[in-house]
Each structure stands twice: as structure tokens, then as C-alpha cells.
Amino acid sequence: MSIGDVCSARFIFVTGGVVSSLGKGLAAASIGALLQARGFRVRLRKLDPYLNVDPGTMSPAQHGEVFVTDDGGETDLDLGNYERFTGVNTTKEDNITAGRIYQQLLAKERRGDYLGHTVQVIPHVTDLIISFILSNDDGADFIICEIGGTVGDIESQPFLESIRQVSYRLSKNFTIFVHLTLVPCVGSAGELKTKPTQHSVKELSSLGIQPDIILYRSAEPLPQYQSAKIANFCNVSADNVIPALDVESMYKLPVMYHAHKLDTQILSHFGMGAPEPDLTKWANVLTMVNNARNVVTIAIIGKYTKFLDAYTSLTEALDHAGMHSGIKIQVKWVDSRLPVRESDLHDVDGVLIPGGFGDDGVDGKVLAIGYARANGIPMLGICMGMQLAAIEFALNVAKLEDANSTEFNQACKNPIVVELPWLQKGEGEYLLGGSMRLGSCTYRLSADSRVASVYGSTVINERCRHRYCINPQYKNVLEEHGLSFTGMSDSHGLVEVLELQSHPWFIGVQFHPEFKSSPFAPHPLFTSFVQNVLQIKQRGFMHKSVSAAAILVPGSSVVS
């Protein structure tokens, strides 16, 4: 049976050269959005050459955020861009890594599936990669596959060989190669250099892949003679040398790529006709971005503030809420690993505490939560941010001595936060990767709560990624002191939402709402947060009379 017998979709393979982090994921997402706007069904996938099974245990400082899918996949952040640009939910099967391929390969070898054969990279590894590429097309007209890394990386070679084989077996009528490269600007004269692109294409061609379209990343379009030079020496049509220009907003990319006929050239390659794309919604987004008049400053207190890819979905969700509310969001990044001073918080209009792991930077986050609580500053805590809000309240309001999380101190007197019951270590091997509570869950909200009003419903579905939870033994004592637990999980009875109803806007959620926000449908929790930040700022409700020095953090002595 040939590949064509099992898959009728066209394949668009997006590769990158010269350097990493050029924007392959956004280019792939933009292609998907443009084809979707012409009436086609699309599916996007990411192939990562690293040997981790998934990015779940990788440092955000190296890899960026871990994007969680509805079905519990811990995936590359590019899948978040795919979802935001196309509105098509991805799954854990849309992100494959070399580690996962080798895991499957070795399991098959141990079962005897290769009995009698010498297991090799070619054909056994490449066959598994090809199987992933072709699987579960769900009736898509186009499957867009982004290959992580850079052409020339040793670890990328099996993936590049796999897509070469797919193209050979399907024929050029069903595959197209889009290669993104860098055209650097060198010297004080600002000379644009095309030689790195030529070498990158030469490297790709040596592996049996001839790019059909070259996207060159640059601050400005190349002069015609330089564009023609790339076409000539890289063996592509001059019409297929297309700029991938720096833009102020990523949401300008589909409009820009269409203006340079990227989608037109792709369809021409396949000999397919289609109506012009309806880009009205993209134009509307850009109008909203440009028309925001009110400005608020929101402090994000985290430990990866030098690596902003760690918070991609978070900052995008803030921007979505802001653009739909006519508000420009200025983010003030505060490194929680450094001493957080009152001067870091005195000029902010809102505080956001993101998720995280480990005790590094916890005191800075707790101090910021306490300062926001005591001074009427809107505060949104997500995942660990919610857990720390409960700990801060226990220390400073309920006066519970040595209130803490067992993640940070197993021997604390008052464990406000504990490991999920079904994850607590017992006999045998303890696996860290892939063992958290992951994916979409159903939550029930108190009918009279602020958060139910925000959602307009008492039953919601959100994505989670956590190993720890609020200790139910402390629910009553914290409620007696004024903290409300207004959301519970449908299946396990866990505390999922807390709020302080005496505060202008103070909400913590165990789940990750940022994963379900889009530029066309901002998440209601972020919208409420941003709008209340502006309203409270304009009304002057924040008094900022309580000093940050008065806030107790874990390990502090409680003064009765």
C-alpha cells in the first residue's frame, strides 16, 4: 500500500536555516491561517529533534513554556501559536520528539517486532517518523509540519530524511518545502548579506531536499537584485523568494505574508485554485491593537523574566484581553529570585503571579501577593500563584505559624499546600516526567462567586498542569478568616479557585486559563482582570498604605 492510499492531504514542510528562533512556528501558523481563510481545513504539527520524550521536564529558560493540550500533552510552545492563529485544537499527537520516537523504537525491539533484523536509524527510525507525519489527518486538506532546530544539526538528519522520503513517495504534487533563513545586516553601512541563505540551502540540498519557497527573515525587504541572487543561486523561482519581515505584532504576519503572495504561491505549486482569503478578522485585530488608548501596568512576578518565551501564552492572553478592551498592557517584569522591593510594586496597577515549580523565588512572589492583597491592587494567581495566595493569607491573615507547601518544606507545621493524593510517593521508582495532573478538567463554581460572574456559568472546562493542591484540611479555617474557595474540581473534589470577596479583584485559579485565549476570543478571566485593573486605577481604589516590609513570607515568624 502506498502513502497516497492512506493519506490524501497535501503536506507543507517548514524548515529553518542559519540560526534557530527565526519564527518557523509563526510562519507555519500564518500559512495555516491563510489557507483556512481560503476555506481549507488545516492541521499543524511540530517535529522536535531533541531526545527528551516531551518538554515537560525541560527548563523554560532553555525551551520556553510548556503548552498543554486538552488531551494532556506537554508540548512545544509553537502548538500554542498554532491554536491561537487557527482556532484548531492540537493534541499530544501533534508534537513528536526524537526521544519519543526512540522510546517507541526500543519498546518495539524488546517486544520482538524487529526479530531477525538489525535496528537502524534508516529505515526503522525514519519509518516511525513517517508514520507520525501521516497519522490522523482528520480529513485535513493541508498538514503543515514544522521541523524544529536548524538544517545542519546532527539530530535533525533523521527528520529531514523522513520528509524527503514522504515527498519522494507522494510526489511533488502533494508536498512543498518552505525554508526560513536569516539575511543578516552587517556593518555600519547596514549591508544585507545573502550568503548565509545560500549556504543553508546548499546544506539542505545535500540532504536531498530542494526548497520550493524561501522565506528570508530581515528587518526590511531585499533590493530586487539581491532577491534575484537568492533565486538564482538557490534554484527557486524569483516569485518564491518572500520576505519574513520583523513586525511589531505577530498578528500582522498573516496579512504581511498574504501581501507577499505566500499563500498564492503555495496553491500555485499544488495547482489548486481557491477564493481570495477573508482576512477581515485579522484586520480587525490589528485595528484594535493600534487603537488602544488606555494604558495599565501589570507586574508579572516570576523567575524566568530574562527568558520571555517562558510566559508566551500568558503575555498573549493579557494582550488579547487588552486589545478587545481598548487597553494597552505594559508588562513590568519582576524577578522573584531577587529581593522584591516596594519600589518594584509601588507604580503597578495589577499583579500577576504565574505558575512555576520549586522554592526558588517563592518569597518574592508571596511578598507581591501580600502587597497586592493589603493595598487593594488587582491580583491574578495562576497554578502555583493560587497556592502561594493561600499560603500568604494563612501567614498574614489567619496567623498560621510556618504555613507553607510541602513542595518547599516537607516538615512545615501547617502544610497549606500538599502533593496530589494519588501522586504521593510510595514504594518503587518515582517518575517525574508526565506524571502530573494534565489536560482538560471540569470545574464547578459557586453560583454567587465573582468568578462565576466572570465566566457567566457555574460549570467550566480548563486545562491544568500541576502536582500540588490546596490541603482540604485547611479549607474551613481559611474560610473563617475571609478567604472564599469558589471553585472545585468535578472529579476529585479539589480546591480549584479562590477569591477574596472583600478585595476589589483578587482571584487565584489552579488551572491555566492562558492556554485557551485567542486574539479573536480573549479569555474571560483575563478580560475581567484587565478591565478591573483599569477601572480600579481610574477610581483610585488602591491606597498602597501597607508597606511590603510588613508582609510575612514562608519561614517568617508569625506575630500574633
Swiss-Prot record:
Which GO molecular-function terms appear in the entry?
ATP binding; CTP synthase activity; glutaminase activity; identical protein binding; metal ion binding
Activity regulation (record text): Allosterically activated by GTP, when glutamine is the substrate; GTP has no effect on the reaction when ammonia is the substrate. The allosteric effector GTP functions by stabilizing the protein conformation that binds the tetrahedral intermediate(s) formed during glutamine hydrolysis. Inhibited by the product CTP, via allosteric rather than competitive inhibition.
Amidoligase domain as annotated region, ranges: 1-272
Record-annotated residues binding Mg(2+)?
D78, E146
Task: Give the residues annotated as active site.
Answer: C383, H512, E514
GO biological process terms, alphabetically, are: 'de novo' CTP biosynthetic process; pyrimidine nucleobase biosynthetic process
Give a GO cellular-component term.
cytosol
Q: Which reaction does it catalyse?
A: UTP + L-glutamine + ATP + H2O = CTP + L-glutamate + ADP + phosphate + 2 H(+); L-glutamine + H2O = L-glutamate + NH4(+); UTP + NH4(+) + ATP = CTP + ADP + phosphate + 2 H(+)
Instruction: Identify the stretch annotated as signal peptide in this record.
Output: none
User: Which residues are listed for ATP binding in this entry?
Assistant: S21, L22, G23, K24, G25, L26, D78
State whether keyword Metal-binding applies.
yes
Stored SUPFAM superfamilies: Class I glutamine amidotransferase-like (SSF52317), P-loop containing nucleoside triphosphate hydrolases (SSF52540)
Keyword set includes Metal-binding: yes
Tell me, what does this protein do in biology? Catalyzes the ATP-dependent amination of UTP to CTP with either L-glutamine or ammonia as the source of nitrogen. Regulates intracellular CTP levels through interactions with the four ribonucleotide triphosphates.
Q: How does it assemble?
A: Homotetramer.
Q: Please tell me what else the database record remarks about this protein.
A: CTPSs have evolved a hybrid strategy for distinguishing between UTP and CTP. The overlapping regions of the product feedback inhibitory and substrate sites recognize a common feature in both compounds, the triphosphate moiety. To differentiate isosteric substrate and product pyrimidine rings, an additional pocket far from the expected kinase/ligase catalytic site, specifically recognizes the cytosine and ribose portions of the product inhibitor.
Protein name in the entry: CTP synthase
Q: What organism is this sequence from?
A: Anaplasma marginale (strain Florida)
Lineage runs: Bacteria, Pseudomonadati, Pseudomonadota, Alphaproteobacteria, Rickettsiales
